[in-house]
């Protein structure tokens, strides 16, 4: 038998402090019969109706004029499905009582959630439109184990926290309520009384859709359908395939010309996909698209990890964008940020009054570089929340890979901290063992559940084994950004050519560690912001030399082992730094403006991508010493480099770069194979606005010793240029 309803209990509902509503509301067995209790602020009358027959059963007594009703059905001993006819003055409506429905989360689900071993917690937590006992509605669930009370508030109840307090499951710390007649598209939040008695209004961490900033509510949205991985997409991700990535910030790639506002996902698909296809890129990498409050973070401070940002449209529209990329044969990579989150009050910070998602000690839980909070990777539920989010984007939107941001800040406890600002691990070391285990677990989950999907690490240190299998002690990533190569080569390219001879090793040192990891060569957004200048702006010399330097550098990069990544705008040598609030300077491609300098770089990048995809020596053996051989590595005086790229079937391409403005005629290079070498690329071609110094299409080897080899070729190396020479098939 149930306990009687006291005035204190009723008062607890109206001051929104009652944390156990199902102990009081709904149907309860008493000595007199079944008693029905309902809470509906401001209602005048309440009548119980049998749902199946529509028959009026009884009118409930109003025991508190604020809107609390109680009534007994004499001699009734069996619970039944009912509805409530509610009178508001002279108006009446029939509603379903959310407190007549049984719990929908089972013991196994609760155990898996608390253990952090549920593969797809987003199928259980959050807001799910569904049908229960023939009634459509939304089932809301929230993990907040230390809250005293949680209510669901939204469009459906005037954002009144008194109306729909939720059921607490102590085994898992999950609050639950099925809300009949709630529907897709409605806005909602969770209203909590935290462990300290403070009122908090929180967005849903598992929301599939969110409001556009500055509004912060979650939106009921359907769980996206599973997108199956295809064999073609799997193949395009493999390490022995050409991977050329176009990195894109959706808010500034191209904007509406009339009002400088964003294009939506569908408009972006109309313009971006054909452009990327035409340019020959194999992959698009989007800067983070999980919902985020501050435009200036570029998405790198997300709060709605399961919500595609509403800046550009709905989750369904984002799905269409990915689908159209796939239809064009382009794979999609998404930047993913599990390293930290902002402290906006509607977000994860102090979620239930405790440091639920973050660490309580700021030496572990506060990131001073970005004024953000660091996830507690040692907590099962948090680890599962994050790792499953990666799977969600891959499985539910068809994203082909993730690029994990700021890995170094995750795996080192002393990252950007001085002594006294960090806590050693249990062994006294600086490694964040929990974060390392989290990354291994996430990569295991990705590769076991979405075979063919890839993960890429932005890891800026020499941490060993980033791309090694986790079973061999590695982190389990497929690729790692080669930050060392990028920093060294850009430092070299910034130098006046007369000084480059003294820094020759900056262009060659990368081969010392080339085979330690599977690398991507990144010329990313980070290199064209915050006073670093554009890539073109980094190049020394007058206009001709700046463009020639950049073209030569691109040629060197596309010939060098490693997958390629280029941030938008760099494909046509935008002259100013990237600005996230403006479109790229597409007008620079008008040849009437500057004589075609920028158009020349655009043509070069397009040709580089096409040559890259069509020639196996340039991509097949990136991670094998069999695929590379230095031919000229020590000619610092002339700033000349030459190396051979090879494929498994014996195809060979020689890459020759001259990083001085002096043409090198009759320059002899030792070769491994006798034959004719055809010039398939020359960054100094007049087609790219170069000076057109070259080799008239082909050079033949001669039996003249050079660079320790019996045979050699004599070539003309253009000024500030890179040339590709392909061995002709016999």
From Swiss-Prot:
Keywords assigned by UniProt, alphabetized: Carbohydrate metabolism, Glycogen biosynthesis, Glycogen metabolism, Glycosyltransferase, Transferase
InterPro entries cross-referenced by the UniProt entry: A-amylase/branching_C, Branching_enzy, GlgB, GlgB_N, GlgB_N_E_set_prok, Glyco_hydro_13_cat_dom, Glyco_hydro_13_N, Glyco_hydro_b
Pfam families in the record: Alpha-amylase, Alpha-amylase_C, CBM_48, GlgB_N
GO MF terms, alphabetically ordered: 1,4-alpha-glucan branching enzyme activity; cation binding; hydrolase activity, hydrolyzing O-glycosyl compounds
GO BP annotations, alphabetical order: glycogen biosynthetic process
Database matches in CDD domains: AmyAc_Glg_BE, E_set_GBE_prok_N
Keyword Transferase (UniProt): yes
Record EC number: 2.4.1.18
Catalytic site: 405, 458
Matching SMART domains: Aamy
Pathway: Glycan biosynthesis; glycogen biosynthesis
Enzyme class per UniProt: transferase
Catalytic activity of the protein: Transfers a segment of a (1->4)-alpha-D-glucan chain to a primary hydroxy group in a similar glucan chain
A cellular component annotation (GO) from this entry: cytosol
Subunit structure: Monomer.
Family the UniProt entry places it in: Belongs to the glycosyl hydrolase 13 family. GlgB subfamily.
Protein purpose: Catalyzes the formation of the alpha-1,6-glucosidic linkages in glycogen by scission of a 1,4-alpha-linked oligosaccharide from growing alpha-1,4-glucan chains and the subsequent attachment of the oligosaccharide to the alpha-1,6 position.
Protein known as: 1,4-alpha-glucan branching enzyme GlgB
Lineage: Bacteria, Pseudomonadati, Pseudomonadota, Gammaproteobacteria, Pasteurellales
Name of the gene: glgB
